[in-house]
Design a protein with these regions (language model features):
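Extended, charged coiled-coil "arm/hinge" scaffolds of SMC/Rad50-like chromosome-maintenance ATPases
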Residues: 270-301, 308, 315
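ATPase nucleotide-binding head domains, primarily ABC-like/P-loop NTPase cores
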Residues: 351-576
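Structured, charged N-terminal subsegments at the starts of enzyme catalytic cores
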Residues: 188, 194-278
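Long, charged, glycine-rich C-terminal linkers/tails
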Residues: 179, 325-363
């Protein structure tokens, strides 16, 4: 009955991954974006943790992308699965599956567990029906469908359904119990015992009076202890003020069996209240129908390791796709463009492990958050390949350099997480990891100074990254003098070319971009890699930012005059 655990995130549970740091997720804005997907912190954290795990295997990426496409396009399936998941989640959170099994549990507890198993069966049936009726194409969902069908048709599962059905039929016949109470000379309860377990309910008598009516009439007092199979009874409320304290009430107020009971007749402990009657009946029913209790325990023990846990483990995985699908669909309805990513497999495109073709891409934060640039989103194209490995990105301040740098990082996080990317198309070779070298917070640079902290952090990143990593640098080494910063930056780019990782380095040091040919020639002579660095610029339209990028030589000016004119701080504007 046992089978391999199924996952909608990992086609191969042994696949290797690297986890992005919290700093990287923050630098890319993914931590804030994940918070938009759910109001529940636990779900936010789960989604972010899934996205932070970077699997370089293109099979994992394609597996996820195909699943997400099914979820996004099948809204009814999405809604139905959410409803089923809520039911399964309730069983997991409040049911007894996650509790230790108590061998001393009474029949009522056992039947409650049986009801939970029955609810689980209904959930599996519902998932089976939902998947069978949906137009799904992904290997992940087709595999899940087969997995559920295997559970659905499994001999053990079918037997469980039969066992539960039979047990429910047996236990449903438990309608009432008949209790015998002995009285002493003072009409006090002297002993109580179970006479029978009945398949009929007792019904309220319209002609019997209270206890005194019973003892006042001789024909109401039986001459023996043989029950006459009369299912009429006189109910009472032990909490009602009007109830007279009678010997019968005392009997009902003290109905708990002592552990030393034998033969079905027990002495009554003092001080217990009528609320303990249920506990008493638990014990006497267990005693009288021990064969049924034994049977229920056998069934529960037999199926204690059934695939409930495996199915409940799918809940957060499905939730991951559903939450993203709901949010992406919401943004699509607002007019934002999204597309399914495609991962290159080994053997395709000459197995270029550095390939990336991005078309019409933009920063997801522009769609999620209201910013200065949100009203004017400019899509861009960018390529990486075996030759184009490093981009030195220059342009005006607030011209969009950081925005596009973040966007490229987001593309890989989203695509390798299976989620549609913001843009028209994205074909790529997955990265082993993403590393960001953005300006650190001031309080983190007190010991080493800002430049010292940047150097230490870059060295740690460089040592951990490999040729298939993605490195994103944002104004690195710009916190010191131009000469010092340029010297460190140039050596860093040379080292990056030596390792061969895909890199975007946005900077205001235009001289660094001018020197790419020199660095490329040096690398070619050393024959370290065939990758090269290229200058990339953010275009200007006069004094206006275009946010459009292009591979081109740096324009060679700092745009300080345009900024000064915009804010009125030129000499002429200040002294006029």
């Amino acid at each position: 009955m046992s089978q391999k655990k199924y996952s909608l995130l990992y086609p191969d549970t042994n696949a290797q991954y690297r986890t992005l740091s919290d700093v990287t997720m923050h630098d890319l804005g993914m931590d804030q974006i994940c918070k938009k997907l759910s109001a529940k912190e636990r779900e936010q954290n789960y989604i972010q943790n899934v996205m932070a795990r970077m699997y370089a295997d293109p099979a994992v990426t394609q597996y996820r992308c195909d699943i997400f496409e099914d979820v996004l396009q099948q809204k009814k399936m999405r809604d139905d699965l959410m409803e089923i998941l809520e039911r399964i989640s309730f069983l997991r959170e409040y049911g007894s599956f996650n509790r230790e099994y108590d061998e001393s549990a009474c029949i009522w507890d056992l039947l409650h567990r049986l009801d939970e198993l029955n609810d689980y069966i209904k959930c599996v049936d519902a998932i089976h029906t939902c998947l069978a009726a949906s137009d799904i194409h992904s290997a992940g969902f087709l595999g899940l469908k087969a997995y559920v069908e295997k559970i659905y048709a499994d001999n053990g599962f079918a037997e469980l359904k039969k066992d539960i059905s039979e047990l429910k039929m047996d236990t449903s016949q438990l309608k009432s119990i008949t209790v015998g109470i002995n009285l002493n000379d003072r009409f006090e309860a002297d002993g109580i015992g179970l006479i029978s377990v009945n398949s009929k309910y007792f019904t309220k008598s319209g002609i019997l009076g209270n206890f005194y009516d019973h003892i006042a009439s001789k024909d109401r007092i039986n001459e023996d202890t043989i029950w006459k199979k009369n299912f009429k009874f006189q109910p009472f409320d032990v909490n009602a003020d009007a109830v007279i304290s009678t010997p019968m009430q005392k009997v009902m107020d003290t109905a708990v069996m002592r552990s030393e009971s034998r033969g079905g007749i027990v002495k009554l402990p003092e001080g217990d209240q009528a609320k303990d009657v249920t506990r008493y009946t638990d014990r006497i029913v267990n005693h009288m129908i021990s064969h049924m209790v034994k049977r229920v325990r056998e069934v529960l023990n037999k199926y204690v390791s059934i695939t409930i846990t495996d199915m409940t483990d799918l809940i957060p995985e499905l939730l991951y796709y559903i939450k993203w699908a709901e949010y992406i669909q919401k943004l699509q309805e607002q007019g934002f463009t999204f597309a399914k990513a495609s991962a290159y497999k080994e053997g395709e495109n000459e197995s270029d492990p550095y390939m990336m073709q991005a078309r019409g891409i933009y920063n997801l934060k522009l769609a999620v958050f209201e910013t200065e640039e949100s009203g004017n989103i400019v899509p861009n194209d960018m390529d990486f390949d075996r030759n184009r490995r490093v981009y030195i990105l220059t342009g005006a301040n607030r011209g969009g350099k950081t925005t596009i740098t973040q966007a490229v990082g987001q593309l890989f996080v989203l695509a390798q997480g299976g989620i549609y990317i913001p843009g028209k198309a994205f074909t790529f070779s997955p990265v082993t990891g993403i590393y960001t070298h953005f300006p650190a917070d001031e309080d983190k640079t007190l010991d080493l100074g800002r430049l010292g902290e940047e150097c230490k952090r870059f060295k740690a990143i460089y040592e951990e990254a490999d040729s298939r990593s993605l490195l994103l640098m944002n104004e690195s080494f710009s916190t010191t003098s131009f000469e010092e910063g340029y010297y460190i930056a140039k050596d860093s780019v040379r080292a990056i070319l030596h390792k061969g990782m895909r890199t975007i380095y946005n900077t205001h040091m235009h001289k660094l971009a001018f020197d790419v040919e020199e660095m490329n020639e040096e690398q070619q002579k050393a024959e370290h890699t065939d990758g090269k660095a290229f200058s990339m610029i953010v275009h200007m339209k006069g004094t206006e930012r275009s946010y459009q990028i292009e591979v081109a030589p740096p324009e060679g000016k700092s745009y300080a005059s345009e900024i000064a004119q915009k804010y009125g701080v030129t000499y002429e504007m200040l002294v006029k």
